[in-house]
Amino acid sequence: AIVEVTPEGIGRNPGKLREIAEGSGVHIVSGIAFYDQSTYPDWVASASIGTIADYFVKHVEEGQEGVRAGVIGEVMSHNEAVANPSGYRLEPLEEKVFIAAAQAQRRTGVAISTHASLGRAGHAQLDTLERAGADLSRVVIGHCDAHWHEDIERDLSYYLPILERGAFCQFDMIGWEQLMP
């Protein structure tokens, strides 16, 4: 199976995924989420957390174009390179979407996949999801390899606390030569 988490606003296309899956025989799990704030649908800023959660739940339970989402993701918080990951904070609108993702996860049982590159935002994302009641054993922190260092201890100091909290680290930047030549 392939988990495909292109969010709304930057090319999510459930109908095309279905066509590819049927043509190839490969099971594709589609995600539902929003990317960065510049690509959020206009209604998100004024919507309640519950309304956003309902939107995610509807995509999981009913689907779009005959395809139900099997994961909430890729849920993103802004890319900000910070020297100390503990200094990273989600912006208020991002926090609202993360809380909605946690609520939708509790209602549906599906996993959450995040976008946490550059700023090493995984800890702040997990903090928000945990406060909102998410099951961290069903959370994947994406792009953990986006800031690979020669100093493995520095990297482990980021990865191990994520794993100790029960979440998963996703290493998915393989082949992106601009990042890791």
Tell where the protein language model's regions lie, with residue ranges.
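Catalytic domains of carbohydrate-active enzymes, especially glycoside hydrolases
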Residues: 1-3
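Conserved residues at the C-terminal ends of beta-strands
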Residues: 5, 75, 142
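A generic structural signal for short
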Residues: 5-6, 89-90, 114
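Gly/Ser/Thr-rich loops at beta-strand to alpha-helix junctions
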Residues: 6-11, 117-121
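Metal-dependent catalytic neighborhoods of phosphoester/phosphodiester hydrolases
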Residues: 12-19
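Short, surface-exposed alpha-helical segments at coil->helix boundaries
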Residues: 14, 95, 122-123
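Active-site gating/metal-coordination segments in enzymes
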Residues: 19-23, 27-111, 146-150, 165-168, ...
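Active-site core of metal-dependent hydrolases
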Residues: 107-181
